[in-house]
Amino acid sequence: MLETIVKRERDFGTPASTSTEMISLTIDGTSVEVPAGTSVLRAAAIAGINIPKLCASDNLEAFGSCRLCLVQIDGRRGYPASCTTPVEAGMVVHTETSKLHEIRRGVMELYISDHPLDCLTCPSNGDCELQDMAGVVGLRNVRYGYEGQNHLQDEVDASNPYFAYDPSKCIVCSRCVRACNEVQGTFALTIDGKGFASRIAAGQNEDFMDSDCVSCGACVQACPTSTLTEKTVIDMGQAEHSVITTCAYCGVGCAFKAEMKGDQVVRMVPWKDGQANRGHSCVKGRFAWGYATHKDRMLKPMIRKRIDEPWREVSWDEAIQYAASEIRRIQAKYGKDSVGGITSSRCTNEETYLVQKLVRAAFGTNNVDTCARVCHSPTGYGLKTTIGESAGTQTFDSVMFTDVVILMGANPSAAHPVFASRLKRRLREGAKLIVIDPRRIELVDSPHIKASYHLPVRPGTNTAVLTAMAHVIATEGLIDEAYVAERCETEAFEQWREFVSRPEHSPEATEAETGVPAADLRGAARLYATGGNGSIYYGLGVTEHSQGSTTVMAIANLAMATGNLGKEGVGVNPLRGQNNVQGSCDMGSFPHELPGYRHVSDDKVRGEFERDWGVKLQPEPGLRLPNMFDAAVSGSFKALYCQGEDIVQSDPNTQHVAAALRAMECIIIQDIFLNETAKYAHVFLPGSSFLEKDGTFTNAERRISRVRTVMKPLGGMADWEATCALSNALGYPMNYSHPSEIMDEIARLTPTFAGVSFSKIDAMGGSVQWPCNAEAPDGTPIMHVDQFVRGKGRFMLTKYVPSDERSTRKFPLLLTTGRILSQYNVGAQTRRTDNVHWHAEDRLEIHPHDAEDRGIRQ
């Protein structure tokens, strides 16, 4: 997937038709068969006939403004635009005639007469569609001369830190406006003025930074000239080659082309064929990659014996040997279980797999954990119990077939913006939205979208709200009885029906506790049960909670009761927070589970790993991270290997975490920056950014995508190599020569990954969704199609238990946290990019009445 020369991706001009009916026509003497609804422009492109175009793009609806794609059709008058003309059976189309040549040259003359001819010094020289089309139509001179004064008096808008807007280069094709509207769904751009005075305007003729623009880059991607251009391209020039890889921010898992000049990244371009993002991106993935070469990067291994001593730079060999000797010393003194490890949801599947293997096989303990257990293990437990698998059920594409969406405890506009854009498109097409969230998130009321219901649930009462919705569905006869009878356990269902039908679970009875008006809750429940395909998407507002697992079960109950599982447009879908939260769970980063969610106490399962790894494994679950902290404070836990995780900043009760770290005798940090946790470390191993990684990430839709090395590890060693080196120094051999060999081992030991390999992923177009095995050799886009993984679905009783964390006289307010579009997690990466132009510090939002009571004015 390495391109030696950067080429513009093929564009068919208009979107593909989804029709199954085929239409035959003739274009320039060539017989062509395409789906009904296909444009003539696209049909020609499929046949290898490239009709000139400027306003058309296959990720935008046909517009027909540039007048370059005109064709001649037998039996029709005039010269219709091929982008807006659908094919018809028997149609005979001519794309090359003397009259068409004359018209196209005339159109191009008009464009060029009002365009600066500074091509040699233009940043888009060699990557400009206007330049290309001038050559295609054979334009050699301009009869009107060159005035070119239009817009030249307008200043370049360089307010955005990542791209510049030069109105003098604009041909008013409207592609940027349409991309903002159709692809992103922000509606931040418009055409201002008329005729020669027309120009693109951001907001109310504001600078881009002062407008509603979210800097997703869709307009830059759509622009056929240098009107909208990345500043890195302006500074560095055109790229020479590119590498396809996967973004390392949120759980969407966008595919990108890293366009390079030598060993430097020029720009990150969303890959059109990326199955998770379909050529779209957000401000983080598109632009916020500069942290990888930030001056704060730590590129040398370091050690120190005490945390109050200065760091000493050493060789990789000395750092590894020192870390290994400390692990051996501590285990000899305090026992095997005095050490443990933490995997990262930011690292690849292969790296994560090796860390848990290191802990189990080389350390000899099950003391391994991950942040993903805190944020999403309720999903694993809740879904495994009810429907049999620990992951979401659908693809992101599935949302385009939904009719009703429940969005609970999630704010995808900020946390999963590329998915949010696709959701917005479906909502603009007519799907209904129910938001269950304490906050009035952007999707409640955004451009051309208004939620049918916003249920402002009181923090901590999620389970009560969902059980009340189930009460409405059960007592009003809205259950899909046939589906339940065929797919679910009868006894468990009847117990659930009786439970939710009790009067104490009615919306009226729960309103005082949940804060949700009973009428709204009833309306939302009826809409979900009767509105057609119903899908549920949820986030950390559901799972990071004392009743997280119970709430996930309640979500699954609703889906089963209404028959909304096992087909397109429905499902239960957790929106994973980090790029490899799903993968870190899949890879066995839990103290009680081996890769594939199989319990360490299962003798048969453990035996498989023991035979493959050549070592005896502990049958008892190890310590979770909070237990490690407690044990460290009490004196029995003494060493920690922490890869790609800043636990001081990200884990709760910072003072307790710091006390635990101070009590340990050896902390090994593997990271790209000297973070807060590193203040307590004794060994620092330079980590690799995603641009230096080779392996796979697994996103929120179970999609395993390739991550490819864009540049060599700046610290001299890849993360997986460092883990292997430490294991070898401890006496347990890890002798892999490439991450593909690690994936082969994962596939050998994990049933849901049995058919996965790097070559398989490449053959599938860059990604594959697990389960991928003999039963599903090409992966599984939709889960539970014919039956649930566990056989019959199991309804669970979801008793509401009030949270212990309530407002008191001493603590009168409740704090709920949320994502910010421009920043990511604790900000280690994004704070080292120009994203600080939007948010350089955290802000606390407080109700005006609460602020007034406390004398807070701003």
Each PLM stretch: what is its role?
Residues L2-I5, T14-T18, M22-E33, G37, ...:
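N-terminal export/assembly segments and adjacent metallocofactor-ligating motifs
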Residues I27, V339-T343, G534-G539, P574, ...:
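Short hydrophobic beta-strand segments
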Residues V32-A89:
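N-terminal cofactor/phosphate-binding cores enriched in small/glycine residues
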Residues T38-R42, P86, T348, R624, ...:
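Short, structural beta-strand-to-alpha-helix junction motif
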Residues S584-C585, F590, P739-D834:
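Long, low-complexity segments enriched in small/aliphatic residues
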